[in-house]
Regions:
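Sec/Tat signal peptide C-region and signal peptidase I cleavage site
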Residues: 19-23
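Short beta-strand segments in beta-sandwich/barrel cores
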Residues: 55-56, 72-77, 93
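Short acidic-glycine-tyrosine-enriched beta hairpin
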Residues: 81-98
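Ligand-binding loop in jelly-roll beta-barrel domains
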Residues: 71, 98-119
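Bacterial N-terminal signal peptides
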Residues: 7-18
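A short glycine-rich, His/Asp/Glu-containing loop-to-beta-strand
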Residues: 30-55, 66, 116
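Glycine- and acidic-residue-biased ligand/ion/polar-headgroup-sensing regions
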Residues: 61-80
Length: 120
C-alpha cells in the first residue's frame, strides 16, 4: 500500500512538472504572439509581435539573441514577481541569458522582435 501511494505521488509530481514545463514554452502559452520561422537541432527562431498593451504570460527561454525590428517600452516580471522596465530600440541586438518571465508591451504601438533561442 505504501509503495503504490509513493508511486502515485511521484507520478503526480512528474505530471505536474511536465505540464508546467510545457506551459512555459512561449509558443504554447502565446501562439498568436510567437511564430516559429525556423527550428533545428541548434536553434529555434521566433518572430514575436506584442500589440500595444498586450501581455505574454509567464514563459521561459534558453540563452537567446533578440533582434529588435520595431522597438518599444516593456515591463517584464520574473518568477519572484520583480518587475523590470525596459525600452528596446529599433535595430538593437542583444544576448539574453536563459530566463523565465512574463512580459507586457507598455507602449502605444506594436513591438516586433526576432528571438533566436540557442539549443546547444
Amino acid at each position: 500500500m505504501k509503495t503504490s501511494m509513493a508511486a502515485a505521488t511521484v507520478l503526480g509530481a512528474c505530471l505536474l512538472l511536465a505540464g508546467k514545463a510545457n506551459a512555459q514554452d512561449p509558443v504554447k502559452v502565446a501562439p498568436t504572439m510567437n511564430k516559429v520561422v525556423l527550428e533545428n537541432e541548434r536553434v529555434r527562431v521566433l518572430d514575436v509581435t506584442l500589440k500595444a498593451g498586450q501581455q505574454m504570460p509567464m514563459h521561459q527561454h534558453p540563452d537567446n539573441i533578440v533582434y529588435v525590428i520595431k522597438g518599444g517600452k516593456t515591463r517584464a516580471v520574473n518568477l519572484q514577481g520583480v518587475p523590470t522596465d525596459r525600452e528596446f530600440k529599433d535595430g538593437e541586438c542583444t544576448f539574453r541569458p536563459a530566463e523565465t518571465h512574463a512580459i507586457q508591451n507598455t507602449d502605444t504601438h506594436d513591438l516586433h522582435v526576432i528571438n533566436v533561442e540557442l539549443k546547444k
